[in-house]
Regions:
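Aromatic (Trp/Tyr) and acidic
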Residues: 1-141, 164, 170
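Solvent-exposed beta-strand/loop surfaces of large extracellular or lumenal domains
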Residues: 135-173
Length: 176
């Protein structure tokens, strides 16, 4: 999404993460599902496969995953995925921002985000509002849903008027 700033790409990454990548590995970690159980008559997890490409790609994806949580451009920060985490982002000379996310997502939809700039700084913070929470299961029309979640956003315990553009709610303000 760094090329376009559109949240639909992170929606798809999140869908793959929770519905495919993480579910393909057995709890013991030594078996992997190679076929889509929704599209196969019989499915099982294998300990070894003649072409073992999926397990190494899973490890590669797992290693790359933290890099998808946050992104930024020269003006502001994107919160792409909801994961308990901490990071530091340099927006420009003297604009170092510390971010901390606390959440039990996907089991609980509440996310607490702490924004701590080294000094008071104005910048837009763009928080992805997942398509599924807006009733958009898939931006390509592959899935449909009537489900919508109530979306609430607060800054310092004060409600924020949600303006969603390209899948992100933007809060442009001076952060302290």
């Amino acid at each position: 999404n760094e090329l376009t700033g559109e949240g639909k790409y992170m929606d798809e990454l999140e869908r793959v993460l929770y519905n495919s990548a993480l579910t393909a590995v057995s709890l013991s970690g030594n078996q992997y599902t190679y076929q889509n159980p929704l599209n196969a008559e019989k499915h099982n997890r294998w300990e070894w496969h003649g072409c073992p490409c999926c397990p190494p790609m899973f490890l590669k994806f797992t290693g790359a995953f933290p890099g998808f949580i946050y992104s930024h451009d020269t003006k502001g920060i994107y919160i792409n995925l909801f994961v308990g985490s901490e990071t530091q982002i340099q927006l420009g000379k003297g604009k170092e921002i510390q971010l901390k996310q606390e959440t039990e997502y996907p089991w609980n939809g509440t996310v607490q985000l702490t924004v701590s700039p080294l000094k008071a700084t104005r910048f837009p913070l763009r928080i992805r509002i997942p398509g599924w929470a807006q009733g958009i299961e898939n931006p390509y029309g592959l899935y449909e849903s009537d489900l919508k979640d109530e979306i609430k956003l607060y800054v310092n315990n004060q409600p924020v008027n949600l303006k969603i553009k390209d899948g992100y709610a933007e809060i442009d303000r001076k952060w302290y």
